[in-house]
């Protein structure tokens, strides 16, 4: 779904609001505008840091955690984004670099959706400032609709399925939120829409926060559902090819912001799933504590090899205990890992299909 359609759908719904609903919409937009204004100073600082790193004769720099400008202890704060900026700054020519973001829009993200949205908006503003090609999508699979927001009986489907292909979720949609080609006004509208959505859904888990009641509901086809990450990575094969062709990028960074593993993808007639990497076929099957066998891992490996892709993942949690089924460390290092996470509020993992996977 292109960003123009996303903006238009919200505008049509907004036109139907009456009375108090209009006041509540104004409140949501004002909150979004306030955040963008407050964040502009921090983004400008990060841009300055980026330019310093590009300049070979400037060796000294003040780390973000010591400036006082950015709070390194804030969940999903700029300290975590700095690792992304380091990836960008390692490229000699920024104009030949691009970024694609995938935002998890599943129901379980409600607890994290506001800080995640704020983090995403800061990254988008940063990319706009340094003028690199980028595109931002949220992946959803609202079962009421297909990719065009029609009834599920609508004949058009995103995947061509046969008995020999993975049985991907046909309700999967990639909603484009932002792109470097957006006008300033369209960027603002998209930012207001996603911020309002985060206010609305985030209120479900916070009884002290009246925003769920106060903020108007959003268009039905943009509601939260589950996590079609694998389907989204399959779609990236098409999106990345066009992105690299259109913008002549030498390097592309793919960043996912999620709170857990992908939905499973089944096969027909009990067949086993495999993906071809180079001259070899690799079986894709779920094994507990062995992510290197699953479909997500192999899809990332496929995309990295085909597109010279850098991959960065963010896994969002409230506390270290939530990592017990995802982040696996030797028993003797468990106490150290817990201590690092509690101190820094994040911990990196280099053993997944991503180049680096941050548990935040």
Give the location of each predicted region:
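Acidic, glycine-rich A-domain
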Residues: 1-360
């Amino acid at each position: 779904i292109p960003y123009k359609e996303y903006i238009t759908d919200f505008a049509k719904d907004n036109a139907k609001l009456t009375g108090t609903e209009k006041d509540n919409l104004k409140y949501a937009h004002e909150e979004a505008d306030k955040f963008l204004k407050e964040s502009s100073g921090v983004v400008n600082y990060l841009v300055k840091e980026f330019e310093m790193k590009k300049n070979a004769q400037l060796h000294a720099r003040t780390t973000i955690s010591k400036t006082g400008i950015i709070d390194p202890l804030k969940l999903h704060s700029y300290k975590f984004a700095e690792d992304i900026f380091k990836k960008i700054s390692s490229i000699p020519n920024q104009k030949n670099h691009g970024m694609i973001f995938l935002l998890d829009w599943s129901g379980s993200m409600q607890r994290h959706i506001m800080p995640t949205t704020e983090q995403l908006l800061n990254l988008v503003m940063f990319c706009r400032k340094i003028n690199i090609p980028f595109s931002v999508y949220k992946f959803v699979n609202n079962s009421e609709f297909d990719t065009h927001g029609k009834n599920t009986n609508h004949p058009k489907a995103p995947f061509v399925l046969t008995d020999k292909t993975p049985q991907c979720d046909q309700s999967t949609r990639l909603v484009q939120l932002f792109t470097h080609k957006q006008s300033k006004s369209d960027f603002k509208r998209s930012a207001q829409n996603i911020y309002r959505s985060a206010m609305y859904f985030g209120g479900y888990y916070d009884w002290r926060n009246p925003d769920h009641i106060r903020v108007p509901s959003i268009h039905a086809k943009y509601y939260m559902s589950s996590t079609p990450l694998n389907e989204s990575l399959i779609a990236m094969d098409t999106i990345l090819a066009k992105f690299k062709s259109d913008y002549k990028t030498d390097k592309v960074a793919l960043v996912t912001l999620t709170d857990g593993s992908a939905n499973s993808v089944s096969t027909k007639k009990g067949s086993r799933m495999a993906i071809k990497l180079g001259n070899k076929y690799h079986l894709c099957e779920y094994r507990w504590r062995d992510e290197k066998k699953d479909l997500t891992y192999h899809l990332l490996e496929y995309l990295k090899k085909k597109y010279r892709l850098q991959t960065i993942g963010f896994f969002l949690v409230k506390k270290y205990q939530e990592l017990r089924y995802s982040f696996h460390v030797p028993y003797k290092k468990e106490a150290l890992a817990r201590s690092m996470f509690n101190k820094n509020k994040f911990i990196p993992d280099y053993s997944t299909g991503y180049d680096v996977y941050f548990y935040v």
